């Protein structure tokens, strides 16, 4: 793709939008950026772009801005069916995302990880496994560094390990990961995709451009993944926590094994993992498949996994205050992630739920809440819906995270767990799930400091 002298519009001024705009400008494109946020909301970003000679439009998306372009690059948070984009496509203007842009400019090998839950942990772990195997590795995508930023860092021997969201997969054309994994597919982002079927179809696109010798890694315990495997053109590696598989990873007698036509290899005991929870066993199984597919030796895989700690905001132990353990799982932005968090504790859980609703029912939590939780504290815009649907456990309307932590700390007794696993997006009260998690940790640490006085 040659963008020199081309008029390119970048829509959305998040991390990937800014990275795309600055990269395209450096490549000689005539770049305009457009964001519906106000100039005041973008006061930090705008000067950086103007200094590079990039035209900035804020507060709205002008029809003419979209019309007078040779290429449009959209950020993941921008709806693919936005009217201005629909009109641009009708006019024959290509509309792609930042991941597709990266696919055309970043050299080297690509590993892509998607799924409803576990993406960030697995992507980070895969990066550690490849580094342990002596490979030049870059980790990013939907976490940390936008993939397009790797254009200046990668060469033909580099492995780019990317977390990929369903939003990013909506806009791919040539994006082809040599190794791609779907960890699981459960209801999420239904407010964006409309139906579960459309959401699953977006996830499946990760394999769309793979070739026969590439690898597709899939969860044998997840029905949508099993269905997707029937349509995959590449080599399938399975992972399963529940049963043995012929080609892939599984658990037998609390040990992780990899099996293929050449035979069976023990990788490591499950007890050697630092990660907590059954769902993290699944994440490790998937990451081991990635390591094997990338020709990393079993002992190097074992070393990386045994040293890997929980990623921030993913079932992250925060502190123990008056005998009560506090865990930050702010990344649990859907119901299935909250289920996995609850399954990590046997009883005595004080659960903080709520935020911006994503369209899934909360009734599926009820059996587990009855079994393992003492109290649910609701916060944010979804509070009323949660309070109407959650049964079999005490529910307290807390409104804010600060009040929820306060109420939970007053009610919890020694041996209990206070768990932030909201099952919702964060944007009603916070800038991001990271922001929500940081606030939770600050509140808990203040209590811990008070206890020491």
Swiss-Prot record:
The protein's role, per its UniProt record: Cell wall formation. Catalyzes the addition of glutamate to the nucleotide precursor UDP-N-acetylmuramoyl-L-alanine (UMA).
Keyword ATP-binding tagged: yes
Binding annotation for ATP: 115-121
Subcellular location(s) per record: Cytoplasm
Entry superkingdom: Bacteria
Catalytic activity: UDP-N-acetyl-alpha-D-muramoyl-L-alanine + D-glutamate + ATP = UDP-N-acetyl-alpha-D-muramoyl-L-alanyl-D-glutamate + ADP + phosphate + H(+)
PANTHER family associated with the record: UDP-N-ACETYLMURAMOYLALANINE--D-GLUTAMATE LIGASE
Name of the molecule in the record: UDP-N-acetylmuramoylalanine--D-glutamate ligase
Keyword tags: ATP-binding, Cell cycle, Cell division, Cell shape, Cell wall biogenesis/degradation, Cytoplasm, Ligase, Nucleotide-binding, Peptidoglycan synthesis
Organism annotation: Koribacter versatilis (strain Ellin345)
Protein's pathway: Cell wall biogenesis; peptidoglycan biosynthesis
GO cellular component assignments: cytoplasm
EC number: 6.3.2.9
GO molecular function list: ATP binding; UDP-N-acetylmuramoylalanine-D-glutamate ligase activity
Protein's UniProt keywords contain Methyltransferase: no
One Gene Ontology term from the biological process aspect of the record: peptidoglycan biosynthetic process
NCBIfam families: murD (TIGR01087)
Entries under HAMAP family matching the protein: MurD
EC class name: ligase
Family named by the database record: Belongs to the MurCDEF family.
């Amino acid at each position: 793709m040659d963008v020199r002298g081309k008029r390119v519009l970048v829509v959305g001024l998040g991390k990937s939008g800014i990275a795309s705009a600055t990269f395209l400008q450096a490549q000689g494109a005539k770049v305009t950026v457009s964001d519906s946020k106000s100039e005041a909301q973008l006061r930090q970003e705008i000067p950086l772009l103007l200094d590079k000679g990039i035209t900035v439009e804020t507060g709205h998306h002008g029809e003419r801005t979209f019309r007078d372009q040779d290429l449009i690059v959209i950020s993941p948070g921008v709806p693919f069916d936005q009217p201005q984009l629909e009109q641009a496509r009708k006019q024959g203007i290509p509309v792609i995302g930042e991941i597709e842009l990266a696919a055309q400019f970043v050299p080297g090998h690509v590993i892509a990880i998607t799924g409803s839950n576990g993406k960030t942990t697995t992507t980070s772990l895969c990066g550690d496994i490849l580094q342990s195997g002596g490979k030049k590795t870059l980790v990013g995508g939907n976490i940390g560094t936008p993939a397009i930023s790797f254009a200046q860092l990668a060469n033909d021997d580099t492995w780019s390990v990317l977390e990929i969201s369903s939003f990013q997969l909506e806009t791919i054309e040539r994006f082809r990961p040599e190794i791609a994994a779907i960890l699981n597919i459960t209801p999420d982002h239904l407010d964006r995709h409309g139906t579960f079927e459309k959401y699953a179809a977006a996830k499946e696109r990760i394999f769309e451009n793979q070739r026969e010798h590439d690898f597709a890694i899939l969860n044998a315990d997840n029905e949508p993944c099993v269905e997707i495997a029937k349509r995959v053109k590449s080599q399938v590696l399975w992972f399963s926590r529940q049963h043995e598989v012929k080609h892939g990873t599984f658990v037998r007698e609390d040990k992780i094994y990899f099996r293929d036509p050449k035979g069976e290899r023990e990788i490591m005991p499950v007890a050697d993992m630092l990660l907590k929870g059954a769902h993290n066993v699944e994440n490790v199984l998937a990451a081991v498949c990635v390591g094997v597919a990338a020709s990393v030796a079993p002992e190097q895989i074992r070393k990386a996994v045994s040293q890997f700690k929980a990623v921030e905001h993913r079932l992250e132990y925060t502190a123990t205050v008056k005998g009560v353990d506090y865990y930050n799982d702010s990344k649990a932005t859907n119901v299935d992630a909250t289920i996995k968090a609850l399954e990590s504790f046997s009883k005595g859980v004080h659960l903080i739920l709520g935020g911006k609703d994503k369209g899934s029912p909360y009734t599926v939590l009820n059996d587990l809440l009855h079994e393992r939780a003492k109290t649910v504290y609701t916060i944010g815009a979804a509070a009323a819906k949660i309070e109407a649907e959650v049964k079999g456990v005490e529910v307290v309307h807390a409104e804010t995270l600060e009040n929820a932590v306060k109420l939970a700390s007053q009610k919890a007794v020694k041996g209990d767990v206070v768990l932030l696993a909201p099952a919702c997006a964060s944007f009603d009260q916070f800038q991001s799930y990271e922001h929500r998690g940081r606030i939770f940790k600050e509140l808990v640490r203040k209590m811990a400091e008070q206890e020491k006085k």
